[in-house]
Every structure is written in C-alpha cells, then in structure tokens.
Amino acid sequence: RDLRMSRGLGDVYKRQSKTYMIAIIDYNAGNLKSVEKALHFLGEDCVITRNFHEIETADKVILPGVGAFGDAMEQLKKYELDKVIHQVTAENKPFLGICLGLQLLFEGSDESQGVEGLHVLDGQILRIPDQSGLKIPHIGWNSLHLQNDGRLFAGLEENPYVYFVHSYYLKAADEQIVKATTQYSTTIHASVESGNTFACQFHPEKSGTVGLSILKNFAKLQGGNA
C-alpha cells in the first residue's frame, strides 16, 4: 500500500488555518513526517503545524521528535509552543509525546543539564547506565511490560515488542502513571499516562502493527474532560 506523504511541512503561516483532528507540533525536530505518514495510513486527519489556532482547535495533539533536549526546548520557546503545550494539557486534551517528546514533558535531562523541561509531568531524564555488552544508544526492538491498565495498550498482547532509539530514559516521580516498562541496562519507564496526557519513549510509528494499534487507540480517545 502506498504510504507516501500527502502533505509537506510547507509554511504553516501562509495557509488559511482550519480545524484538524490531530495536530503534530512542528518545532524543527526530526521524525515528524513518519508520524504523519502512520496517521494517514490509519485514515486519520492530521497536520504538521506550529500554528497556534490549529493546535488549540485540534481534537488531539502529538509532540514527536528526535534530537537533543536542550535544542528542542530552545525551539519550543522560540515559537512559544511551550505555552500552547501547557494550555492544551491543562485543558485535558488528549496529548501524546513520542521519544524526545516524552522527555520534554518532564523536569529536565542529563543530556542538557541546567535546561528546564516543560514540567507538565514530574520526573527526570537520565542517561542509560553503561553495562558490558550493551550498546548505547539503545536502538532496536524490545518488549514492554504492561502495567496499570494503560489505555494506549488496550487490546494488545501481554508483552508487545516496540522500536526504541534513545540514549536517555525516563525515571518518573510517580510510578502510578507508568503504564509500560522495558529493560535495557536498567528499568526504563517506557510509557506514561496522566489524565489525557500520554507519552512513549519508543516510536509507535516505527513499531509495525503494534505501534499502529497504539496510535489508533490514541486517535479514539475523547478530548477535554469528557
């Protein structure tokens, strides 16, 4: 099946704003198009944007990304996207952080010490400990241990395999929000859920049918305080 992109990044400020089901936040990070392509494959209406109106009026919002924590926070603040992220998460709009997008939701990262994260959720991003025989970054497929009935994982098998690419990992302050863990040198908090704010360290858009099921579960969520 043809999974080519039907929309490029373009200049979001030159087009007339409209309402989309899912807004994918554009902050000059990598991997945005892979997320859009996966959502289009699922038949979901989505747009890559940094337009405030499109983000605020979307039913759901995704913050993907591959890159460095400090650079990403600089870009979010440059476009004042940190403000709209705080707004939509406070409104309990379904929000999904992916990989770097997960890390940015927390307090700070060993990767960019002294740089404050978004503080949407409590926890720190730590470097994966060195261990003999394990390469860092952690790249490849790994199994998840599901716990605490995460809505993203509804209908999935007990220990699904998903795709990771990262050198830093989440240590959430509240383990009740942790919905999946994986093992790689240490216990990694691989997915969290707090209200309608969700985040995955792995890449659902690169995780085959399991990842598509996770994205579909996110797309089916109700927004606001419903």
Regions found by a protein language model. Name each.
Residues I22-E44, E205-K206:
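N-terminal beta1-alpha1 ligand-phosphate binding loop
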Residues G108-Y184:
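Pocket-forming structural segment of enzyme catalytic cores
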Residues T187-E193:
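Short, surface-exposed beta-strand/loop micro-motifs that present aromatic residues
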Residues R1-Q16:
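Single conserved hydrophobic/aromatic residue that forms the stacking wall/gate
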Residues G67-I139:
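Cysteine-nucleophile active-site neighborhood
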